[in-house]
């Protein structure tokens, strides 16, 4: 029993809030939010996607779209881990819809090739490209990971 208690204490608190409803959500950019979960404020990075930076073309539109997906909705986080910056990594669900997927499907984020595990996201990205949705309206959109290296 003592071992189990110590094991539980060793887990990062972020991992204990899986499937927890979020409150007081504030959108930082197209792939990052701040929210309260079980009374604790956390910063959340949406996994497997990369949205344009705020100073990049479509950055503001991406942030606004994410805000519309989350505003006054029941939002749940499924934790996938934590990144090197201390952000909780996870999938967001708004009224039971996968927000990470919707960001890609409507052209407001790229599939983050380096970290993508859900191959079905590429189907939605290809569809958004074919339909010239969101950032895919631009002639040659620059992926955020390329943009960051250039700046």
Residues covered by each model-derived region:
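Small beta-barrel nucleic-acid-binding modules, primarily SNase/OB-fold domains
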Residues: 2-151
């Amino acid at each position: 029993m003592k071992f189990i208690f110590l094991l539980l204490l060793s887990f990062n608190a972020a991992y204990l809030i899986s499937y927890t409803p979020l409150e007081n959500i504030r959108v930082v950019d197209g792939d990052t939010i701040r929210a309260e979960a079980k009374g604790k404020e956390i910063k959340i990075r949406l996994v497997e996607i990369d949205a344009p930076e705020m100073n990049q073309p479509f950055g503001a539109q991406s942030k606004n779209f994410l805000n519309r997906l989350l505003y006054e909705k029941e939002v749940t986080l499924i934790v996938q881990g934590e990144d090197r910056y201390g952000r909780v990594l996870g999938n967001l669900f708004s009224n039971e819809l996968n927000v990470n997927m919707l960001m890609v499907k409507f052209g407001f984020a790229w599939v983050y090739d380096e970290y993508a595990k859900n191959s079905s996201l590429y189907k939605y990205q290809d569809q958004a490209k074919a339909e010239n949705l969101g950032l895919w309206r631009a002639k040659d959109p620059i992926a955020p990971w390329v943009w960051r290296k250039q700046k």
